[in-house]
Amino acid sequence: MRPDNRAADQVRPIKITRHYTAYAEGSVLVEFGNTKVLCNASIEEGVPRWLKGQGKGWVTAEYGMLPRATHSRTRREATNGKQGGRTMEIQRLIARSLRAVVDLEAMGEIMITVDCDVIQADGGTRTASITGASVALADAFAHLIAKGQLKKNPMKGHVAAVSVGILGEDVLCDLEYVEDSAADTDMNVVMTEEGKMIEIQGTAEGEPFSHEQLLELLAVAKKGIADIVAVQKASLLD
């Protein structure tokens, strides 16, 4: 039995609150159970130097955790003078995932940065960040269209992500921290709303997993992501 009595293939309760802060063109608080992430999308004129003159836009992301997002305080990375490897890996993952569903040529020379700040962590912070960032990005593009800066929406669809894992004999969806820390296999899966794969990150922490288990993990992830995309779409109707 899971700590919150969910079914093995069930995601946690998901809540997406749009327009959460006043200034960002896209601002979302996304909650997966007790994991809470603030995703703010900011629009900037111009693109990185290496893209100038190509008529393309750019979407990037930054990720961080507040010092008391976890049970004990962690130092801000700024006090160490540099970002940690985990942080850099996660923010690159978020950015890659978003760009997979954006037509950069349709943006013109505009850059959007999505800042994902973890307020409270209980497993799945990177997957929650991707899910919330997708909605924040959609709102940022809607802002550009409303202002007449874009004629068509460069976003081709939603992107969402979920963690899956093997704990004992069970394949679980959307692991909270106590499950994640005990799992034999931990995997993060990113998909488009059509169920196409963007990224799969999986590791056997304990027992190696079989090809059949891999297929089961992906099937559970696909179902979970379909449920998450439904919440994303519903949130954009508000």
Curated annotation (Swiss-Prot):
Function: Phosphorolytic 3'-5' exoribonuclease that plays an important role in tRNA 3'-end maturation. Removes nucleotide residues following the 3'-CCA terminus of tRNAs; can also add nucleotides to the ends of RNA molecules by using nucleoside diphosphates as substrates, but this may not be physiologically important. Probably plays a role in initiation of 16S rRNA degradation (leading to ribosome degradation) during starvation.
Enzyme class: transferase
Domain of life: Bacteria
Molecular function GO terms recorded: 3'-5'-RNA exonuclease activity; RNA binding; tRNA binding; tRNA nucleotidyltransferase activity
BP-aspect Gene Ontology terms: rRNA catabolic process; rRNA processing; tRNA processing
E.C. numbers: 2.7.7.56
Gene: rph
Keyword set, alphabetical order: Nucleotidyltransferase, RNA-binding, rRNA processing, Transferase, tRNA processing, tRNA-binding
Name of the molecule in the record: Ribonuclease PH
Alphabetical list of Pfam families matching this protein: RNase_PH, RNase_PH_C
Organism: Vibrio cholerae serotype O1 (strain ATCC 39315 / El Tor Inaba N16961)
